[in-house]
Regions:
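Transmembrane alpha-helical interface segments in multi-pass membrane proteins
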Residues: 1-20, 25-72, 86-101, 105
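Short cytosolic juxtamembrane segments of multi-pass membrane proteins
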Residues: 107-121
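Membrane-water interface of transmembrane alpha-helices in multipass transporters/channels
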Residues: 77-88
Length: 121
């Protein structure tokens, strides 16, 4: 179940980033035409993908922690403990998924021809 959730999250990030590249084609073309290195464009979109996944991981951790506390409140005999190592590992996995999912759209954005990109607007 967890693997399927990670896969769906990764596909969601790829989709969101692909749409972002398509919507910002003109901006990307302008940046490249003004001399921005392709590496900068790549890092811009990779950073956005990582930020999205880190935020999603953090919100998921908050939701999980809140649900665990609600269960502990309803069933006090049930011990609820979340080790910090699990929290850090979960956030690291979320960031890694975001980084992996952002590579394709970021490479596509970095490889855009500035003339064609500016022509689309």
């Amino acid at each position: 179940l967890g693997g399927i959730s990670l896969l769906v999250g990764g596909v969601g990030i790829v989709t969101i980033m692909t749409i972002a590249v398509a919507e910002r084609t003109g901006e990307i073309g302008l940046l490249v035409a003004l001399g921005a290195p392709r590496r900068t464009i790549l890092l811009l979109f990779l950073g956005e993908a990582v930020a999205l996944s880190a935020l999603g991981g953090f919100l998921g951790l908050l939701l999980g922690f809140g649900l665990a506390q609600a269960i502990h409140f309803a069933l006090p005999a049930l011990p609820v403990h979340t080790p910090i190592s699990f929290v850090l590992l979960a956030e690291a996995v979320a960031i890694a998924i975001g980084l992996a999912a952002g590579v394709l759209p970021a490479r596509r954005a970095a490889r855009l021809d500035p003339v064609e990109a500016l022509r689309t607007e």
